Structure formats: structure tokens, C-alpha cells
């Protein structure tokens, strides 16, 4: 009798606790760049083959890697469990800025993330294969990427965000190897206008995308984020803007990602009801 009770309790514990989020490290081939690209995929503990799940594409910053988020902010696995969403973290190269480079045909990261990667993930995993089931955000270079890719691919993403994002590249012509990707500013001034988030705002219409922007007041990107917020207000584009004391570091991003994931969870839940 005692043995039966013990087994019953163990089974109850197994069912109640379940398994935590799982982390897959995969390689996705990019035809446009003719290479394999490492990507982390986090599946929530509720993941199974019977249901479909929303996906957050979470981008790393300059000099980062596909595993930066899961190593430096490991609690995102718990957030994936809490909200029942998948998280996909692709390798964006150390300095791609998630552009299709106009001066280097070997860099096609906009196409990779917004087309090739998403198509691959939708084939291999039980995703919600529509813009209502996709969001994208990131930190620093990845914050630029999150907004830039979503603004330009609104048929793919339904929500987007940025944490400490480089949302206007023009004040920083000599930084982060951007000149290697879009040409030096004096020789290619049009590229610096065309490849910045600030000049994609004409693509937006009210209530098409859910948008969240977050930047610390001690961050060197704070002023350009504040300016983006003001431009969105001027254009009557609804968005959430968060600023609080903080710098350009993982202490800030570990906190910011919690608010971003709650924001995207709310978006996914509202989309289910439509």
C-alpha cells in the first residue's frame, strides 16, 4: 500500500512540475549567404506536437552571438515557460546590423531573419505561422534590427520592440563597423539615410504594428530613442516608450526583457481572441 501511494505521489509530482523549457542549438542554411547560421530555439515546457505556439525572435547586439541571450539572461527560459511562447535567437554576425548590405553582397541578414529563418522555423516547429503569432525585438544593434525588420516586413511581424537600440545610426558614422556594411558616410550619404530606423517611419500606419521601445537614461543611445518616441507621437503611431535610470549593459537588459515579453504575451493573447 505504501509503495502504491509513493508511486502515485511521484506521478502527481511529475505531472505538476513537468519539464522546464528546452534549448535547441540548430544550424539554418541561408541560400542568400551560402552558409550555415547558428540559432538557439527555446521551447516552453508546454510545447507539444498537438498545439501551435507564438514565436519571439530575439536579436543580439554588436559583437554578440546566437547564444548571448541564453547565457547572459538565462531567465528568458522561465519567461518562455510563463508565457507559453517560443524564443528564437539567430546569429546576426558580430556587426551585420541585420541589413541586406548595399555594398557587400555576402551580408543578407534582413532576408535571412525575416524570410529564410522564419520559413525554416515554421516548417520544423509547431508555430503560429502568421504575423499574429510573431514578434521581434533585440538589444542595441538587435534593437535596431527588431524595429528595422518589423517596419519593413509588416506582413511577417505583428509586434516589435527595441531595448537600448541604435535607432538612428547617423550620429555614429565611425562606430561599430557600420561603414563596412553600408559604406562610409561621406561617400554614401544616401545609405545612411535609407538604412536607419528613423527613416522607416513613413511605412507605418496607426495600429498596424504593436511597438515597444525601452532605453536607459544613461545610455549613449538615449537621445536617439527619445527622438524616435517624439517622431512616433507626431505621426500618431501608438507605442509604448519606457525610460528609466540605466546604462547600456546586461543589468538593464535583464530587466527590460521582462517588460518586453509581457508586452508580446499580451499581443499574442489579444490576437487569439480576434
Please give the residue ranges for each predicted region:
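Bacterial N-terminal signal peptides
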Residues: 7-16
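Non-catalytic cap/lid and distal C-terminal segments of serine-dependent acyl enzymes
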Residues: 20-274
Amino acid at each position: 500500500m505504501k509503495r502504491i501511494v509513493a508511486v502515485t505521489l511521484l506521478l502527481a509530482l511529475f505531472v505538476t512540475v513537468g519539464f522546464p523549457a528546452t534549448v535547441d542549438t540548430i544550424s539554418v542554411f541561408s541560400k542568400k549567404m551560402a552558409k550555415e547560421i547558428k540559432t538557439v530555439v527555446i521551447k516552453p515546457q508546454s510545447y507539444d506536437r498537438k498545439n501551435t505556439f507564438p514565436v519571439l525572435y530575439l536579436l543580439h547586439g554588436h559583437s554578440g552571438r546566437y547564444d548571448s541571450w541564453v547565457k547572459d539572461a538565462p531567465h528568458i527560459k522561465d519567461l518562455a515557460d510563463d508565457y507559453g511562447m517560443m524564443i528564437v535567437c539567430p546569429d546576426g554576425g558580430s556587426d551585420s546590423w541585420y541589413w541586406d548590405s548595399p555594398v557587400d553582397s555576402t551580408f543578407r541578414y534582413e532576408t535571412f531573419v525575416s524570410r529564410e529563418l522564419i520559413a525554416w522555423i515554421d516548417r520544423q516547429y509547431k508555430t503560429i505561422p502568421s504575423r499574429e503569432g510573431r514578434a521581434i525585438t533585440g538589444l542595441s544593434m538587435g534593437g535596431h534590427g527588431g524595429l528595422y525588420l518589423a517596419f519593413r516586413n509588416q506582413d511577417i511581424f505583428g509586434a516589435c520592440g527595441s531595448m537600448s537600440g541604435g535607432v538612428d545610426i547617423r550620429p555614429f558614422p565611425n562606430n561599430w563597423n557600420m561603414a563596412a556594411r553600408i559604406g562610409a558616410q561621406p561617400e554614401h550619404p544616401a545609405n545612411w539615410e535609407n538604412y536607419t530606423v528613423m527613416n522607416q517611419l513613413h511605412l507605418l500606419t496607426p495600429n498596424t504594428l504593436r511597438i515597444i521601445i525601452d532605453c536607459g537614461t544613461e545610455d549613449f543611445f538615449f537621445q536617439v530613442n527619445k527622438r524616435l518616441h517624439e517622431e512616433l507621437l507626431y505621426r500618431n503611431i501608438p507605442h509604448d516608450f519606457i525610460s528609466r535610470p540605466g546604462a547600456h549593459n546586461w543589468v538593464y537588459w535583464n530587466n527590460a526583457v521582462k517588460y518586453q515579453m509581457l508586452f508580446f504575451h499580451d499581443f499574442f493573447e489579444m490576437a487569439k481572441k480576434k
